[in-house]
Amino acid sequence: MEASITLKKIGKLAGDKTILAGLSFGIERGSMVAIIGENDAGKSTLLKVLSGSEIPDYGNVFIHGIDLTKRRKNSQSYTGFVPFNSDLDPFLTLEENIRFVGSVYGVKDSNITKRIKKFATDLNLMDSLHKPASIASPGNAKKAMIVRELIHDPSILIIDEPTAFMDVRSGRTTWDLLRRLAGEKTIIYVSQSLPEVEQANDRILVMQQGKIILDGTMDRLLESTLQYHQFEIEFVNLTEKLFNKLAAVTTVVNPTKIGNTIHFYGRERAVFFQVLHEAAGELMKDLSVKKLSLRDLLDSEFAGRGLD
């Protein structure tokens, strides 16, 4: 499929700190891409670079084949960017903020009115459009920013935390809208809410320290972990001697001790019984076995160097 966005060796620095480290990848037209990762992984900076609101220190970003670094104004007409925090003009109403951006892009007044009505209705925002941005709730401000960035009908929508500051109902209506737009538009978003990511993605990028360390569909990413199980055994008294004995079992992977509980991974359930055999005679309080999930992909040790 045709790419909406292509990155070639994109780098971003802050003093001597690397924020983005030579990123190269493409994003297919009409796809919904989720970006996840720990704090300070570079997620928000990547969105700003993709939107053209920040220029990379090196490398190139192409929007529908246009080099953003050389023809920034041309390429930005294809994108809408919703940052995490509100950047609305506090002296204007929510509707005035939206209309102003529409006029900047040369959208006809009739189309602005039509789109405001459509998207504000979808987001249950109509009754709040007359309020000054300075007194709007953070959730309604976020909705207004989404409407504002859709007002010029961009082919690419980039959002930092789509449902930040929203209640459950508002979050649900926001995702309903975004899922309807998927396919028609390329949607790229950052979210710390893994349940949201699990419900809305064609592809997931996992970032760590400015790099993409995992990239694929959720099914493909989880396939790499499904051969593993995570085990927990809580003892009445897990001594260092006992922990070291259990950790020494050759089939145990990445054992950790938290209080009186040992956490470890293994490729097969048989590992569990090997550990229980080594712990024979010790008093136990609780046992658990589970498959790895998307949340485990965010564990820096697992994602960064695997379980082996």
Model-inferred region functions:
Residues 59-70, 74-75:
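Conserved ABC transporter NBD signature motif
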Residues 99, 103, 110-128:
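Conserved ABC ATPase "signature" region
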Residues 157-161, 166:
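Catalytic Walker B motif of ABC-type/P-loop ATPase nucleotide-binding domains
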